[in-house]
C-alpha cells in the first residue's frame, strides 16, 4: 500500500515492477507502449483501415474496448454462465467508421475474443501484458472524467455534487490493479466503500460465510488504499476506525462522507498519468520509433512531445465545435479534468473553458446517431509548454496539513495561489452532528479552519518550454487571483450514467 513505506513510482505500478531504477522503469513503460502500438497497427491491418481511418479516435476507442473485453475474465465467465439472447459470449466487437464515397459509414465488426487475445499477446511478445490493458483503462477513465460530471452518482451515495473534483477514476473497472488504485480520487474510494457498506446493511449475509471473508478482505484493502491517499494523521486515524469496525454501518458512512468533505481542503494524494489513445502509439511505432529503447515516462515531457507530433482525427456532429472537442480530448490526454483552468490555459497556450461552456458531447457516437451528417476534423492536441505531473494534492506546507487546491485536484506541479471561498466549504461542516464526535473530527476541522486562501501551492515550480527537456528553466506563471479555475463548477455537463 502506498503509505506503508513501499512507495513505488506510478511507472512501477504501471508495469508491475519490483523496485527498478529510473532507466529500467522508462524502458518497461516504453515496452508497454510498444505493445499497445504494435497491437493497434495489427488491428488496423485486420480491419483494412486507411491511415486516416486508423487515426480516428472513435475507431481507436472501439479497438481498445474490444481487447479490454476480450481479457475481462470475470465478465466472460459470467456471460458463459448466464447466456442472454443475441449476445455471443465468445465474441467482441463494436462500431468501426470508414470513409466511403466522401461520407462516413458505420460498420459493426465482430471478432472471436480468442483471436483478439492472440493478436494482443503476439504484439506483446507472448505476454498477457496486463499493464498495457490497465493503461488503456486509465485512458478511458480520464476521458470519462473530462466528459461527464458525476453529480447523480454523488447524490445517490449521500455525497454533495460540489465534491466532483474528488471523483477521478470513478468509472475505472475494479480489475484495474495498483495502477488503477493510484489514480482514483478520494471521492471515488469513498463512493466504492459506501456502496459496499450499504449492501452489507441491506443483505444480512454480505459479510458472512466463506464469501463474506473475501468481502471483508476487499473492504479492508479498499480502506487501506483510501488511508494511503490521506496526508494528515487525523484523517488516517479516522480511516483506521472505519476499517476496524466490527459491523460497518451508518456511522462508518457518516465518517466517510466527513472525510470526503475534509478532502476538499486537506487534499489527498492522487496520481496523474498521461495515457493516450492507441491511435497515437500505433503510428509512432509504425514510423519506426522504439519506445523501449528510447524509454518513456507517463509523468514527464514524453507524452507532450508525442502529442506535438501526432495527427488524431475525430468525428464531429453537426452542431459541435471542433475546437471544443479538441479541448475535451486534450484534457483527457493530460489527465487534467480536475486541474485549475487558469493553469491549463497557460500550459496549452489557448483558453481552456469550463465543461458547461463547451459545445460538444462525448467522443463516442451512439449506434442510433445519424451518420449522414457526420463530419470529421483534426484534434488539436499540442501544448505551448510542458509541466511535471504531481500527485501531492497541492497542500501548501510541509506538514501536509494545510489548504490543498480547493475544488481542484492538481495534475501538474506548478505554482498557483488557492482562490477559494473557505466559508462555503466550512459551512458544510457546521450543524452536521451525525456520526461520531471525536478528537479526530475536531482536529480535522481545526486544520481546515487554519487554511489560508492567500497561500501558494507548489511554490517556485513552473512550466517548461518544449525544448527544455531536462526541465532546467522553470517559468512560473502568474494568474488572476480572483478567478477560480474549476472545470465543472456552476455547470450542466452530461451525466456519465445516461
UniProtKB/Swiss-Prot annotation:
Region annotation Disordered: where it falls in the sequence: 1-21
Segments of skewed composition (Basic and acidic residues): 8-21
A GO cellular-component term linked to this record: host cell nucleus
Functional description taken from the UniProt entry: Encapsidates the negative strand viral RNA, protecting it from nucleases. The encapsidated genomic RNA is termed the ribonucleoprotein (RNP) and serves as template for transcription and replication. The RNP needs to be localized in the host nucleus to start an infectious cycle, but is too large to diffuse through the nuclear pore complex. NP comprises at least 2 nuclear localization signals that are responsible for the active RNP import into the nucleus through cellular importin alpha/beta pathway.
Entry's Gene Ontology molecular function annotations: RNA binding; structural molecule activity
One Pfam family this sequence matches: Flu_NP
Segments forming a coiled coil: none
GO biological process terms held by the UniProt record: symbiont entry into host cell; viral penetration into host nucleus
The organism's taxonomic lineage, starting at the top: Viruses, Riboviria, Orthornavirae, Negarnaviricota, Polyploviricotina
Keywords: Capsid protein, Helical capsid protein, Host nucleus, Host-virus interaction, Ribonucleoprotein, RNA-binding, Viral nucleoprotein, Viral penetration into host nucleus, Virion, Virus entry into host cell
Top-rank lineage group of the source organism: Viruses
Name of protein: Nucleoprotein
Amino acid at each position: 500500500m502506498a503509505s506503508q513505506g513501499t512507495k513505488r513510482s506510478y511507472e512501477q505500478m504501471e508495469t508491475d515492477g519490483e523496485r527498478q531504477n529510473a532507466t529500467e522503469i522508462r524502458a518497461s513503460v516504453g515496452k508497454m507502449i510498444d505493445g499497445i502500438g504494435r497491437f493497434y497497427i495489427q488491428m488496423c491491418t485486420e480491419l483494412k483501415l486507411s491511415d486516416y481511418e486508423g487515426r480516428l479516435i472513435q475507431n481507436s476507442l472501439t479497438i481498445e474496448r474490444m481487447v479490454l473485453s476480450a481479457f475481462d475474465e470475470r465478465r466472460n465467465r459470467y456471460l458463459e454462465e448466464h447466456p442472454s439472447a443475441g449476445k455471443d459470449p465468445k465474441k467482441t466487437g463494436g462500431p468501426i467508421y470508414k470513409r466511403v464515397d466522401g461520407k462516413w459509414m458505420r460498420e459493426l465488426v465482430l471478432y472471436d475474443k480468442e483471436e483478439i487475445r492472440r493478436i494482443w499477446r503476439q504484439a506483446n511478445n507472448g505476454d498477457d501484458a496486463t499493464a498495457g490493458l490497465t493503461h488503456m483503462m486509465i485512458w478511458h477513465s480520464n476521458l470519462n472524467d473530462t466528459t461527464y460530471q458525476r453529480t447523480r452518482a454523488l447524490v445517490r451515495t449521500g455525497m454533495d455534487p460540489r465534491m466532483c473534483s474528488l471523483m477521478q477514476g470513478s468509472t475505472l473497472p475494479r480489475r484495474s490493479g495498483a495502477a488503477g488504485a493510484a489514480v482514483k480520487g478520494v471521492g471515488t474510494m469513498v463512493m466504492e466503500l459506501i456502496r459496499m457498506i450499504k449492501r452489507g446493511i441491506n443483505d444480512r449475509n454480505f459479510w458472512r460465510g466463506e464469501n463474506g471473508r473475501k468481502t471483508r478482505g476487499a473492504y479492508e484493502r479498499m480502506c487501506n488504499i483510501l488511508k494511503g491517499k490521506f496526508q494528515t494523521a487525523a484523517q488516517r486515524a479516522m480511516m483506521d476506525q472505519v476499517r476496524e469496525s466490527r459491523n460497518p454501518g451508518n456511522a462508518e458512512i457518516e465518517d466517510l462522507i466527513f472525510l470526503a468533505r475534509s478532502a476538499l481542503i486537506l487534499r489527498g494524494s492522487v496520481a496523474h498519468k498521461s495515457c493516450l489513445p492507441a491511435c497515437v502509439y500505433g503510428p509512432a511505432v509504425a514510423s519506426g520509433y522504439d519506445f523501449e529503447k528510447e524509454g518513456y515516462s507517463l509523468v514527464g515531457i514524453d507524452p507532450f512531445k508525442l502529442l506535438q507530433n501526432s495527427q488524431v482525427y475525430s468525428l464531429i456532429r453537426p452542431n459541435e465545435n471542433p475546437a471544443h472537442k479538441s479541448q475535451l480530448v486534450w484534457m483527457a490526454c493530460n489527465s487534467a479534468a480536475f486541474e485549475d483552468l487558469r493553469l491549463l490555459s497557460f500550459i496549452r497556450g489557448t483558453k481552456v473553458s469550463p465543461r458547461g461552456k463547451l459545445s460538444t458531447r462525448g467522443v463516442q457516437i451512439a449506434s442510433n446517431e445519424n451518420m449522414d451528417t457526420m463530419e470529421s476534423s483534426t484534434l488539436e492536441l499540442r501544448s505551448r509548454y510542458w509541466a511535471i505531473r504531481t500527485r501531492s494534492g497541492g497542500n501548501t506546507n510541509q506538514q501536509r496539513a494545510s489548504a490543498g487546491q480547493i475544488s481542484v485536484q492538481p495534475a501538474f506541479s506548478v505554482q498557483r495561489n488557492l482562490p477559494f471561498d473557505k466559508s462555503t466549504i466550512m459551512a458544510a461542516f457546521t450543524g452536521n452532528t451525525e456520526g461520531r464526535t471525536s478528537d479526530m473530527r475536531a482536529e480535522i476541522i481545526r486544520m481546515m479552519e487554519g487554511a489560508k486562501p492567500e497561500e501558494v501551492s507548489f511554490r517556485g515550480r513552473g512550466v517548461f518550454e518544449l525544448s527544455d527537456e531536462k526541465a532546467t528553466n522553470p517559468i512560473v506563471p502568474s494568474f488572476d487571483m480572483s478567478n477560480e479555475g474549476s472545470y465543472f463548477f456552476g455547470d450542466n455537463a452530461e451525466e456519465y450514467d445516461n
